[in-house]
């Protein structure tokens, strides 16, 4: 077939990509951790996290999941906004060989129940702000392990405690909830899971590009939300495609580690998720925006340091 569109590509945009550059998405993560080490990966509320910290935290959480008896291929739901725990959890899920099920934190109980049942998720990592929604439906799902994150978990010992206190007691953003406890369901705090995982051995899991990385659910605008099966190859290809089209702009940056991307789009959406992985591949960093609907704080965040990429959608 004559690819007539290629003549319209800019001169420095490649015509082809090769997803086989990586053996899996986990391979991409591993190389990022090895190559970028002490470079910053993200900043949230002025708390920076390096690639090395992301490596250590995600390995600890992955080890904790493995110690709970989860097997490769099991589905783990991730119900978090754009906070540092998101990348840690996502990397832990992938590195341990599980399938990541991204969940919109603003889902209603009905929507959440459908997605958890349809995906067959056996574990969930959720911000406590939204645990009241989970409490309404958890007994109708296959969830056996709930990891409860608090807003300040990864924001430092002093500032983090203050943020969690403010969110709970001043802003009153954590509605009351009660989750069942027993043999069939365990509740663990995010910080406790990390602490326990640091004492356990992490077992690397062989993976290929054809393994399932994500069950990424559609918006549900025309009916029930449907889980799109995304393999490691799908995500790697998306990352390389995005990088190819950003190449003309990125070539003007002498040091990609200084490239600052604004992560205001929800990371549980595939577009923002792809750009998160692109940052990892390049060694650049993300400015995490937990609540972009708060425009005053959003603008304040944008003013704090120069940014180079602001992904958005026209809706």
Listing of model-derived features with the role each one plays in the protein:
Residues 67-68, 95-192:
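Structural core segment of the AMP-binding/adenylate-forming
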Residues 81, 126-136, 149-157, 265, ...:
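Adenylate-forming
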Residues 172-174, 179-217, 224, 249-260:
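Conserved pre-ATP/AMP-binding loop-to-beta segment of ANL
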Residues 50-52, 213-240:
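Conserved AMP-binding A3 loop
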Residues 20-21, 40-83, 87-91, 108-113:
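Conserved AMP-binding/adenylate-forming core of the ANL superfamily
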Residues 236-260, 268-311:
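Conserved AMP-binding/adenylation subdomain of ANL enzymes
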Residues 75, 81-101, 105-109, 117-123, ...:
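A short helix-loop-beta submotif of the ANL/AMP-binding
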Residues 3-10, 27-50:
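AMP-dependent adenylate-forming
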